[in-house]
Curated annotation (Swiss-Prot):
GO CC term (a single one): extracellular region
Primary location class: secreted
Annotated localization: Secreted; Host nucleus
Species of provenance: Plasmopara viticola (Downy mildew of grapevine)
Keyword Nucleotide-binding attributed: no
Keywords, sorted A to Z: Host nucleus, Secreted, Signal, Virulence
Keyword Signal applies: yes
Protein name per UniProt: Secreted RxLR effector protein 24
Motif, RxLR-dEER: chain positions: 47-68
Amino acid sequence: MRGAFYVAIALLGSHTAAECNQDEPQGAPNNDFLTFGGTIEKMLPRRVLRERRDSKDKLTVHAGAEERVMDPPPEAVEQAIMKTAGVMRTDSDDVIARAAGAIRAHEEIEALFRRIDPTLYNVNGQALHALPKPTNYMVSVASDIPTVPAKRAKVKASADVINNAAWRVSKHDLRLAPPEPSPSSIASSGIRFDNQPIAEKAFKLDLNKHSDEVEIINSNSKRKRIDLTPSHVGEQAPHPLPELQKYKVSVAVSIPMVLATKLEGDGPTLIMRNAANIITTHDFRPAPFGSSTRTVASSNSQIHSQPIAQEASKFALNVDPNEVKSLFHENLPLVGHALHTRVGNDELVPLATVNSIKAGNTQGPYVHKPRMATDEEIHAAFLEAFNLPFHQYLYETSIMIKIVKRQYKTSPGNHRIVESFSSLVNNQELSKLKESLGPDLQNLLAGMLELQDDLKSLREAYYVKLLIMYELFYDFCYVRLDLFDALVPKVDRTVWILKLKNYETLPSHD
């Protein structure tokens, strides 16, 4: 509207200027220009209003024989007309150009086609794209439609077919129709789709011939993700796989300094720095679809393949870890009810000796305690819970279990732990240390061959490995209290290397 207003004013000014520049103005009875006051008589020509019979003009005019003239306007109107005429005379071309440019820009903005991202809405429980708004897609129709096809067809005049087509296109509403019914209703028998030959042939297909290849989807049902579980191992159902995102292990920043403080050294050594680099870059989450507890404990698994693990099955865990030296030379029986014989379902009848003759105890059946997990089961559960940074063998786990089951000073930050591992490490010879470290030897020594035969370096590497692994095993034991009979209250340490989070999310033991 503003552009049209500018154009109207420009045209009026141009017309006024053109009349002012005429060499021979219109004739008048008295003068060539109006005679009312001011300089306006020099700028504007005289206007003669001739009376007509059907004149409905209500303006006040002077009576005359053959013509009537208007009363002079007020002085304010004269000044306004003078200013407008002066501006229009000098800048009329610029005003017209600017007004025309504004009109064209406005028309171009309205004619822009914009892409509208479709929204989603639910149809029968399924998310479908919403149909666009009818006003979003604008189609321009040319005014000379009949001539365009005629020129392309090289015809002199437009034929009736072309004219009819042009008429239909110009009258047609090219906006989108309202949303159609859902796809399920399109296949009904009462609409146009079924009348097409292709649709009729499609419904004649015998789906029973390929029933396995036809997918039937219930529109009211929602697809659910099914968590896969591994197949049975040895005709026994394995433990459910843990959720990877729930196992969070915090790693300390100053690991070399913590190790140096525990070992009472002068400062971090190369082995301590290598160990810190290993665990800071390690992913402690278990691999997907890992081996189950029973498969880990099988004869082909890692825990029985090492010679040190085979010797661990002979150790009596009642022996204090400080006396671990004797464990290498003694062949003690396993802890258990070796003197009891099972009678009936759950009755255990101990045997008594009377005059060197064994006789059954007549004081009643022996009610045994609830069965607790063995070292092998605890070790297998520990391997299954985490992707450990170092190799953990059954012998090492057995020693750690004995430390945790003690009734005092079991926290990894206690000096008692250092003494317990000292007796174990100092008793190891060079060949045994190489077997105990296994593949971890290359990582802890960073490939330095000159240190592989150094007994002091190997003992330090094994010591560092045990201290790190016990930190993670200590938290694991207090998460899996179902694997232990009773433990002392857990100590929340301030100086640590590894710390486990999300205690409540670890899987339970069968």
